[in-house]
């Protein structure tokens, strides 16, 4: 194996999926707090009250909720993010388990509304500051390097309702204040930062709607992305000014796309899919300017961006230090008519007969990870981090309390071997954090039974459970992997 000395092995979570304590110690509600539970066959619902006072629960839409309506938590619905896995009260126990595994890093996010309950305040909530300072201090006690995502899908609800969310340029100001507060308050405790989680999902989400997405939807999506690009660039500049030791990266939802056939139209579609879905966000954040093909993407949907002259200067000055991404699966694109369509992780495509699929329809493709790593390093030539990778699966607790998950071990083994091949081919890969190292609420379906962790959490989809933690077989396996720096994968 060729993993470099000092390689950052660890795991990843997100505040809205694990913390719980959604209305504790001054935290305000976030967009994720009005999403119900769901399943692979039933979408999560967003709940709201319309202008006439009538309650509604509908699948999430890129258009948000109707004009005059307001988000609401309704009776008779289960909101799994409200409690998460109660990391807020279990963080010491959880970090001790990470320390036992030998984690070198732990990727987590900071809940914007825990620091700024509405999002537009000028002074942060000190209870929130204290919580995160305690978490980072605890991680340091175990020599675990925090890797912190500043925004992970959880915009404060107040900003959505009163400003229209990221469609409003004012959110650049509010976000940069939030980011600056994080950089200042946690200086010396955190040096690895990611500005926006899976920033490209704004457009990927629209692709899932196909022809149902209008030009107006694309106009809003690309304007949202522009505001987030500028906010990210400003945050990078602020973070470097506050602490020259800070390393700040982007975070992309990574999917490897393949053409279904060698039909030239499939080859061209595949290239354009990479540009629209993956390269667009990476190019702006890593190269500091919009790529030439951006004009084609905008023209496809009659998009006319509002870009200020100073925005372009900020993009140039605020390029990221490193490129991080999630990787779970690959997908197949084609111009031909196909009937066997599989979807997952903000993408849909033809079934790949050469791959196996999970119970949630996600293709297992470690070679796709190697392909992605080599392509991105060749394109950007900055350090890469795989900050999400994992297999959502059913776990069974045996009578003696043991949890055998050889399928999860095999999944990770294959993907670690793929990373090793990429490193041998010259890729500068510095970190690997498995997704959901401890079981948590699924962002896509709101389920607990879709489990990723090395650590089992006794919480079920109906909200029952005592939140106790248990080690799975994969816990001991990953501990061995880390101790050997990737040498021992048996």
Question: For each predicted feature, which ranges?
Answer:
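Active-site region of glycoside hydrolase catalytic domains
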Residues: 1-75, 100, 118-120, 129-490
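Active-site mouth loops of central-metabolism enzymes
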Residues: 76-90, 167-170
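Internal amphipathic alpha-helical repeat/solenoid segments
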Residues: 84-99, 117, 128
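Catalytic domains of carbohydrate-active enzymes, especially glycoside hydrolases
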Residues: 90-111, 317-323
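Glycine-rich, proline-tolerant flexible connector loops at the mouths of alpha/beta enzymes
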Residues: 110-124
């Amino acid at each position: 194996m060729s993993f470099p000395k000092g390689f950052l092995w660890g795991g990843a979570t997100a505040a809205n999926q694990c913390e719980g304590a959604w209305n504790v110690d001054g935290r305000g509600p976030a967009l994720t707090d009005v999403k119900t539970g769901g399943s692979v066959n039933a979408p999560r619902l967003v709940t709201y009250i319309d202008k006439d006072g009538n309650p509604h629960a509908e699948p999430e839409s890129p258009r948000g909720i109707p004009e005059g309506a307001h988000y609401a938590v309704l009776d008779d619905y289960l909101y799994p993010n409200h409690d998460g896995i109660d990391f807020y009260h279990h963080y010491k126990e959880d970090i001790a388990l990470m320390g036992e595994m030998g984690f070198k890093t732990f990727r987590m996010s900071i809940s914007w509304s825990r620091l700024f309950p509405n999002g537009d305040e000028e002074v942060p909530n000190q209870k929130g500051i204290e919580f995160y300072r305690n978490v980072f201090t605890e991680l340091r006690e175990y020599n675990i390097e925090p890797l912190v995502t500043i925004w992970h899908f959880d915009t404060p609800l107040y900003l959505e309702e009163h400003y229209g969310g990221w469609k409003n340029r004012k959110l650049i100001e509010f976000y940069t204040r939030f980011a600056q507060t994080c950089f200042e308050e946690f200086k010396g405790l955190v040096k690895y930062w990611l500005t926006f989680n899976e920033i490209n999902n704004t457009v990927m989400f629209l692709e899932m709607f196909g022809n149902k997405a209008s030009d107006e939807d694309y106009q809003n999506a690309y304007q949202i992305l522009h505001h987030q690009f500028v906010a990210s660039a400003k945050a990078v500049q602020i973070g470097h000014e506050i602490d020259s030791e800070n390393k700040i990266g982007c975070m992309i939802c990574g999917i490897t796309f393949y053409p279904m056939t060698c039909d030239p139209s499939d080859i061209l579609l595949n290239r354009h899919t990479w540009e629209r879905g993956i390269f667009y966000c990476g190019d702006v954040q890593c190269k500091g300017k919009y790529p030439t093909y951006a004009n084609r993407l905008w023209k496809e949907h009659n998009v006319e961006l509002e870009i200020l002259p100073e925005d372009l200067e900020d993009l140039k000055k605020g390029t990221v230090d490193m490129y991080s991404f999630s990787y779970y699966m690959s997908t197949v694109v084609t111009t031909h008519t196909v009937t066997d369509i599989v979807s997952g992780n903000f993408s849909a495509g033809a079934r790949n007969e050469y791959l196996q699929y999970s119970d949630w329809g996600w293709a297992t493709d470690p070679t796709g990870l190697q392909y992605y790593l080599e392509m991105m390093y060749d394109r950007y030539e900055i350090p890469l981090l795989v900050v999400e990778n994992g297999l959502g699966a059913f776990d069974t607790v045996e009578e003696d309390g043991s949890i055998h998950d050889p399928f999860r071990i095999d999944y990770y083994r294959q993907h670690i071997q793929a990373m090793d091949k990429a490193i041998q081919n010259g890729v500068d890969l510095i970190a690997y954090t498995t997704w959901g190292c401890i079981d948590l609420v699924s962002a896509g379906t709101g389920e607990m039974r879709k489990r990723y962790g090395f650590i089992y959490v006794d919480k079920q989809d109906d909200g029952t459970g005592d939140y106790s933690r248990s080690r799975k077989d994969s816990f001991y396996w990953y501990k061995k992997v880390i101790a050997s720096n990737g040498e021992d994968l048996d």
